[in-house]
Curated annotation (Swiss-Prot):
Gene Ontology biological-process entries: animal organ development; growth hormone receptor signaling pathway; positive regulation of growth; positive regulation of receptor signaling pathway via JAK-STAT; response to nutrient levels
PROSITE patterns found in the cross-reference section: SOMATOTROPIN_1 (PS00266), SOMATOTROPIN_2 (PS00338)
Subcellular location: Secreted
Family classification: Belongs to the somatotropin/prolactin family.
Protein name per UniProt: Somatotropin
GO cellular component: extracellular space
Signal peptide: 1-26
Function: Plays an important role in growth control. Its major role in stimulating body growth is to stimulate the liver and other tissues to secrete IGF1. It stimulates both the differentiation and proliferation of myoblasts. It also stimulates amino acid uptake and protein synthesis in muscle and other tissues.
One Gene Ontology MF term: growth hormone receptor binding
Predominant subcellular localization, coarse grouping: secreted
Species: Saimiri boliviensis boliviensis (Bolivian squirrel monkey)
Amino acid sequence: MATGSRTSLLLAFTLLCLPQLKEAGAFPTIPLSRLLDNAMLRAHRLHQLAFDTYQEFEEAYIPKEQKYSFLQNPQTSLCFSESIPTPASKKETQQKSNLELLRISLILIQSWFEPVQLLRSVFANSLLYGVSDSDVYEYLKDLEEGIQTLMERLEDGSPRTGAIFRQTYSKFDINSQNDDALLKNYGLLYCFRKDMDKVETFLRIVQCRSVEGSCGF
């Protein structure tokens, strides 16, 4: 038999048998520990970027007196995520199941898809990272995918299609260059840092519960 014919037959056999091979488990499933490691790396990258950018912006543009007045004013320091039901204490967090913590994390991530675009100039001018809003958006999308995969593993394996939050943060004027705009950008960075901290914390708890020897890392 000619080489080309043998190759064609082998390809046809492989395509015919592919569904059976999948059902029989011939393709190894990615370990849960690896999925959690990947999600944690992505969450930590976002949290670190949010924290460092917030701190850099604060040191460069926000006088101490403005910082304190901002943080003490509930109207300026209120984040959109406050409307998302999240655990308010360590005890409440521990009472949530792994799946609940993943769902909350997913909602927090999705709530930043549009708002992060309002910080394009801040990210572009950062001396620490020099990333664009599209880069941060891709980081968020990567983590969203990782969390969704974890949720599928913890459920019945069927994909979830939840509603994506499209908060616009309309109170932030990206075209303004005055001091008020600086405070608004500062507020947005404050909320981004706060929410990414929550996501990393929730994922760390899920990892600690699920993977032996992973607590404290």
